[in-house]
């Protein structure tokens, strides 16, 4: 971070499917609270609106595909690509011009991540960019949006001058971390600290629980963080020890980069709804399936937000001249939602369960390695089985009780036996901003090469420093 504390501490969640930004005004002192930045973006040709999230999609239109000025932004009238909501919508119609999952491509060891390979499988004559450049453009959009909203008349408030906490998956290797920092610097950000996403969730839980966290964890415990995001699932295991009379937290294990998350759940709900339409002789095309996925996501969120609802509507626009008249309507019942989500993604399984692996047949095509088994509980069981030795060495088998210490990600199970899946608010960037401020943003580094402090990871560095959260937090969070 910067040698001199900045006015704002900013958290950026550079997600697989959505990006977000939140900040804390350090001038507010103890009354400081994280604030989400509404992000201006193109939502229709020529229409810019503010949204709480920036979808991690980038659209590269073909020649004469859109009218002149369709992609202009308040700060750039000549923009020739789209990032965000319109990119996602238009990409559903022309997928060969849509860049998605850039974050997962950024950690793919089988490709040159600086090479222009995205959109994947696009024709040779199509516009392409690298996974690195896609990350640069997402971050650049956030920088431009911040400066437009927050720093029109104050150069010292520009995002380039603020202390930035930028998340990375715990499963990112050193190369992917270095590329993330390279992308941030290319977007103009210099005062960067990388923070692993599960650790961000853990810090946010500590801050939110105040001193109550001490009653939930003690020496000899293990804390399992299961971060189910929009496109990936990240698993981290933290052991609770003691050092000079204070609790010490050591990260002992990290899971694989599992391409499985909330988007998969929405897609599964869409396929279930499509079968209902098919039974009525209504067959949806690819674009309508994309619309159905968005509608199912909205219906799912309504059902989670209001437990009294038995169902929520889903709609898909018809095709042809009479679009409104041809609107396809249906509903997603709570029973069907629970059946799909719990049965498909959170089924009961034995402790030694293993996710089903797709059988390799002949030559395998290069691409993203999506999880072949959607059961997150099986991936979790396999992770814990692999870490049995580490658990045996560091965790004391006492008390015989298991305690959830927090929730997060896309969905959590309310009950282990057939209960409803409850929504868990994923605070994302807001957690980062709050956690960073709670730690004082405090032990700072100067310039690109400084050491990492405050329990965060310097780009690719294998060491971590002391953490000093407010209200007597853990003394150390380090890697084993």
Regions picked out by a protein language model, each given a short descriptive name:
Residues 137-156, 204-216, 344-405, 424, ...:
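Phosphate/ATP-binding catalytic cores across multiple sugar-kinase/actin-like superfamilies
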Residues 1-7, 194-226, 388, 394-399, ...:
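Conserved phosphate-binding catalytic cores of ATP/NTP-utilizing and phosphoryl-transfer enzymes
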């Amino acid at each position: 971070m910067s040698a001199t504390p900045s006015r704002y501490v900013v958290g950026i969640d550079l997600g697989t499917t959505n990006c977000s930004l939140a900040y804390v005004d350090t001038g507010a002192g103890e009354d400081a609270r994280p604030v989400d930045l509404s992000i201006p973006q193109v939502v229709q040709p020529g229409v810019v609106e503010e949204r709480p999230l920036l979808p991690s999609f980038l659209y590269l239109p073909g020649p004469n595909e859109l009218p002149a000025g369709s992609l202009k932004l308040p700060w750039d009238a000549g923009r020739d690509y789209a990032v965000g909501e319109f990119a996602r919508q238009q990409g559903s119609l022309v997928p060969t011009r849509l860049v998605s999952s850039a974050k997962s491509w950024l950690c793919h060891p089988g490709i040159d991540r600086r090479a222009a390979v995205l959109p994947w499988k696009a024709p040779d004559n199509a516009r392409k960019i690298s996974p690195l450049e896609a990350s640069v453009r997402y971050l650049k959009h956030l920088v431009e949006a911040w400066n437009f909203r927050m720093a029109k008349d104050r150069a010292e408030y520009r995002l380039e001058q603020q202390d930035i906490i930028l998340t990375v998956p715990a499963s990112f290797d050193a190369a992917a971390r270095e590329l993330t920092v390279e992308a941030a610097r290319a977007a103009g950000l210099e005062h960067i600290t990388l923070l692993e996403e599960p650790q961000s969730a853990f810090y946010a839980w500590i801050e939110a629980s105040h001193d109550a966290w001490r009653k939930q964890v003690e020496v000899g415990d293990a804390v399992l963080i299961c971060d189910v995001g929009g496109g990936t699932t990240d698993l981290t295991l933290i052991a609770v020890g003691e050092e000079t009379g204070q609790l010490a937290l050591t990260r002992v294990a990290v899971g694989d980069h599992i391409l499985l998350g909330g988007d998969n759940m929405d897609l599964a709900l869409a396929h279930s709804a499509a079968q209902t339409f098919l039974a009525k002789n209504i067959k949806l095309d690819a674009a309508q399936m994309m619309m159905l996925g968005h509608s199912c996501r909205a219906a799912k969120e309504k059902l989670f937000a209001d437990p009294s609802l038995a169902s929520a509507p889903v709609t898909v626009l018809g095709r042809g001249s009479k679009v409104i008249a041809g609107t396809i309507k249906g509903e997603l019942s709570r029973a069907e939602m629970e059946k799909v989500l719990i049965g498909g993604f959170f089924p009961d399984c034995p402790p030694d369960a293993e996710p089903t692996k797709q059988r390799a047949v002949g030559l395998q095509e290069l691409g993203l390695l999506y999880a072949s088994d959607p059961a997150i509980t099986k991936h979790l069981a396999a992770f814990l089985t692999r870490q049995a030795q580490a658990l045996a060495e560091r965790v004391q088998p006492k008390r015989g009780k298991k305690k959830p210490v927090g929730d997060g990600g896309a969905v959590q199970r309310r009950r282990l036996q057939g209960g409803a899946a409850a929504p868990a608010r994923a605070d994302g960037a807001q957690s980062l901003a709050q956690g960073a401020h709670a730690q004082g943003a405090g032990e700072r580094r100067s310039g690109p090469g400084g050491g990492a402090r405050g329990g965060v990871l310097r780009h690719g560095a294998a060491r971590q420093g002391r953490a000093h959260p407010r209200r007597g937090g853990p003394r150390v969070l380090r890697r084993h």
